[in-house]
Design a protein with these regions (language model features):
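Regulatory loop-to-helix N-cap segments in sensory/regulatory domains
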Residues: 38-45, 93, 105-124
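… and, occasionally, acidic/histidine-rich disordered N-termini of signaling adaptors
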Residues: 142-184
């Protein structure tokens, strides 16, 4: 959905959405890679590492109207793919935790990106970030509920192993209580 909205709002030829791996490393996974009008195979996507690092490490959005002549962002990737204009914005819910990026580019001079395009992409990225965070919170909630059900079941099983009454031994009286040690 986000890629479609980007194509509707910005004159990009290609949109790529990347998210950090869940394993805590800085590895990025391409989640969406589309070229205007068709689905682009994920294993053939190449984007500028310089642009990616600027967004992910510094949290800064990138806008370059002519990447071929911009010394800060020009790279072999840009030259080989003939990329002229680039937009990239971070995906984050708070300013400190960047968990991905939205990248858009165009090979033509007719589709030069502007500050207005950057503002639009930033707004779309904010909405997408909130949706990703909500999905993550929902997954965590479902996992917590699953664990609670498993603990309840374990408590039931443990209670079934306990005798229903203390043993009767002449000359002795027994009393006892048993309850689960761990509860959330």
């Amino acid at each position: 959905q986000v890629a479609s909205l980007v194509f509707e709002s910005v004159p990009a030829e290609r949109v790529i959405i990347m998210l950090r791996d869940d394993d805590g490393t800085d590895n990025m996974q391409i989640k969406v890679a589309r070229t205007r009008g068709k689905l682009e195979p994920i294993d053939e996507v190449r984007i500028s590492r310089t642009v990616m690092e600027e967004v992910l490490k510094n949290g800064q959005s990138v806008l370059t109207a002519d990447a071929q002549h911009d010394p800060k962002y020009f790279s072999q990737t840009m030259a080989l793919q003939g990329i002229r204009s680039v937009l990239a914005v971070p995906l984050s819910v708070d300013e400190r935790t960047i968990f991905g990026l939205v990248y858009a580019d165009s090979p033509t001079y007719e589709a030069t990106f502007t500050e207005e395009h950057l503002n639009i992409l930033t707004t779309l990225a904010s909405v997408a970030s909130i949706r990703v965070e909500n999905a993550s919170l929902m997954d965590a909630r479902l996992e917590r509920e699953r664990m609670e059900r498993e603990l309840e079941l374990a408590t039931e099983i443990q209670q079934r192993f306990q005798p229903s009454a203390p043993p009767i031994v002449e000359g002795y009286q027994f009393q006892g209580i048993s309850f689960s040690c761990y509860e959330i």
